[in-house]
């Protein structure tokens, strides 16, 4: 009995439309997969992970405040994807200094300056403790969204910080201005406001009119900028 003829094989060139279409599909999938990974999965561990595009595009980052160190800055642990990607229930956030080492960003609140605490033997400004306690109560141990604007000379990420409260999403810098525990940043070279400078100044003017916080000091008020020039720069 003669053998059954084998099915003829098709010699497909790498330039065949089917091959080109498949290659294009794989390449596209890899490209968008990588973009998705960078945007929603990859953790930003330190300021060194912040690419120029993240800064230039003011890419929002979601994360957890692990520590408030001063009246206008805090430590931020990036949790990309938030609850939907398991943070807080499947993926645990470190709690010890050892485990958090080289895993957080130091965030400097944009557009504002809080009273200086006691550092290096220098005295503390009035309302520095109140500002620190207020910020701790407001953001410490909570999730926030930051919008990075720049990295300052101390390797801090100057950013807008927003947090959800029962009354809606709040701008942390704006809330500090409202209660008079910060003033609008006076420096020119490193000032970052996003699109909020006019709004911040209006909030400051209202707090000043109502003599909130530091504005209750009246003529005895030394702004944080003036205080730093006197005590840290010898002016």
From Swiss-Prot:
UniProt keywords, alphabetically: Calcium, Endonuclease, Hydrolase, Membrane, Metal-binding, Mitochondrion, Nuclease, Transmembrane, Transmembrane helix
Positions annotated to bind Ca(2+): 113
GO cellular component, as recorded: membrane; mitochondrion
Enzyme category, top tier: hydrolase
Subcellular location: Mitochondrion; Membrane
Molecular function terms from GO: endonuclease activity; metal ion binding
Residue ranges of domain TNase-like in the record: 59-217
Pfam families for the chain: SNase
Topology of the protein relative to the lipid bilayer: Single-pass membrane protein
UniProt cross-references to PANTHER family, sorted A to Z: EBNA2 BINDING PROTEIN P100, SERINE_THREONINE-PROTEIN KINASE 31
Family: Belongs to the LCL3 family.
Name of the protein described by the UniProt record: Probable endonuclease LCL3
Organism taxonomic ancestry: Eukaryota, Fungi, Dikarya, Ascomycota, Saccharomycotina
């Amino acid at each position: 009995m003669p053998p059954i003829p084998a099915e003829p094989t098709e010699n497909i060139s790498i330039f065949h439309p089917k091959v080109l279409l498949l290659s294009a599909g794989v390449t596209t999938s890899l490209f968008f997969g990588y973009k998705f990974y960078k945007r929603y999965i990859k953790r930003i561990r330190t300021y060194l992970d912040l690419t120029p595009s993240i800064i230039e595009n003011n890419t929002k980052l979601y994360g957890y405040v692990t520590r408030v160190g001063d009246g206008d800055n805090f430590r931020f642990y990036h949790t990309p994807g938030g609850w939907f990607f398991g943070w807080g229930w499947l993926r645990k956030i470190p709690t010890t200094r050892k485990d958090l080492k080289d895993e957080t960003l130091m965030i400097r609140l944009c557009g504002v300056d809080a009273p200086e605490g006691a550092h290096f033997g220098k005295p503390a400004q009035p309302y520095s403790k109140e500002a620190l306690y207020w910020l701790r109560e407001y953001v410490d141990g909570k999730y926030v969204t930051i919008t990075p604007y720049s990295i300052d000379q101390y390797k801090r990420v100057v950013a807008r910080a927003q947090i959800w409260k029962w009354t809606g999403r709040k701008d942390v810098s704006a809330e500090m201005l409202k209660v008079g525990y910060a003033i609008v940043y006076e420096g020119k070279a490193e000032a970052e406001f996003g699109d909020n400078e006019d709004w911040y100044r209006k909030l400051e003017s209202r707090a000043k009119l109502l003599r909130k916080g530091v504005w209750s000091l009246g003529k005895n008020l030394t702004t944080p900028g003036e205080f730093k020039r006197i005590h840290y720069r010898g002016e």
